[in-house]
Amino acid sequence: MDAHLVQAKKTSTASELSDSSLTFPFIGDYLSSPSLTTSDYVSDCSNLTVEGPVPANQEFSSSDESSVYISSALRLADYAFTPDDNIRIKPDAVIVICTQCQHQIQDKFFLSIDGRNYHENCLQCSTCENPLSNKCFYKDKTFYCKGCYFRTHVTSTASSCRELGPKCASCDRTIQATDWVRRARNYVYHLACFSCNQCKRQLSTGEEYALQEGNLLCKQHFLELVEGDSGVSSQKAKTKRVRTTFAEDQLSVLQTYFNRDSNPDGADLEKIASMTGLSKRVTQVWFQNSRARQKKWHQKSEGDNGDSQRSSVGPSSPSQKSDSSSEMMYPTSVTTSVEDAIPDSIVILGSLQFD
């Protein structure tokens, strides 16, 4: 199994874990703040307007835009018009041919673009078929009005640019230029997609993480993975208890819920686990151990002949000494074994303990 960690701050060699072929450190780097993509990707073309400048990487070219001139005065000498606008061409008149239909122009007015002449009805947008006047766009031997030209040649190109952007390593969707991202080695993720592959919890800034075969893992699940693989590779290695250290905010949530209900049901355990970022099994073990400590404390209190009154809102740490002159104190970090939370088929190898 090929496993990688991002810029590990603390490392442990394979020999320290087991005699297996694992060659990766077991703690990942602290996760940095997300960044806003800018010059790494193509610009978003959806905000283009007809009047504004168009980026150089689009297909719009100023040479596609032409002015339409209505010609008549210069040709009046070649025609004789009756009061009812019937046309009579003089014998020495210059023959004007429509570039579009290749027929002679005998109208009172005709249109001229860059030296090319057209009937008024012949010069129209190839998409919406509206007559063109003042401005038109000519591309690939086709005339367009302003709106159709930008919809056909600029907006479609903008969509292509967005589709060619980088893909999120998690959801495989395109990352837009305005998306917030996180980076891990050569992988780029949407901010919301940067989550543990096992517990699906979104990783926060400053949190440690690991990369294993392209999959993101939080610190807890990466350690479980290392322990499981070590157990499979060496059945004769000695087993040592692994203890989990709870953060202060996790303890605060656990203690608050313990004060309300020391024996929560499955739904409450899942809710608490989600709030603390712990697994349901680890949360359940914490409550079991806390109830046991509380029961032991009550039994000891009843045997003290009532010499002191102490609060019974929650369990105390086994490492704490009784103090009759103060209320019961709660530790800022309580360690609880997660040995029971790991499947029986996994044998924990080595000595993995972290603060």
From Swiss-Prot:
Region (Disordered) residue spans: 291-336
Protein's GO biological process: cell fate specification; neuron differentiation; positive regulation of transcription by RNA polymerase II; regulation of DNA-templated transcription; regulation of neuron differentiation; regulation of transcription by RNA polymerase II; serotonin biosynthetic process
PANTHER family reported for this sequence: LIM/HOMEOBOX PROTEIN LHX (PTHR24208), LIM_HOMEOBOX PROTEIN AWH (PTHR24208:SF127)
Effect of R243Q: In ky395; Abnormal expression of olfactory receptor str-2 in AWB olfactory neurons, defects in foraging behavior, and aberrant movements. Repulsive olfactory neuron AWB is transformed into the attractive olfactory neuron AWC
Principal location class: nucleus
Biased composition (Low complexity): 306-326
CC annotations in GO: nucleus
Keywords: DNA-binding, Homeobox, LIM domain, Metal-binding, Nucleus, Repeat, Transcription, Transcription regulation, Zinc
Entry protein name: LIM/homeobox protein lim-4
Subcellular locations according to the entry: Nucleus
Tissue spec: Expressed in the AWB sensory neurons and in one RME motor neuron (RMEV), two RMD motor neurons (RMDL and RMDR), the RID, RIV, SAA and SIA interneurons and the SMB sensory/inter/motor neurons.
DNA-binding region: 239-298
Domain LIM zinc-binding: 96-155, 166-228
MF annotations from Gene Ontology: DNA-binding transcription factor activity; DNA-binding transcription factor activity, RNA polymerase II-specific; metal ion binding; RNA polymerase II transcription regulatory region sequence-specific DNA binding
Keyword Thylakoid included in the entry's annotation: no
Subunit structure: Interacts with transcription factor sox-2.
UniProt key word Transferase: no
Role according to the record: Transcription factor that binds to the promoter of target genes. Regulates genes involved in serotonin synthesis and release in serotonergic ADF neurons. Involved in specification of neuron cell fate, olfactory receptor expression, locomotion, and foraging behavior. Required in AWB olfactory neurons to repress AWC cell fate and promote the AWB cell fate during early development.
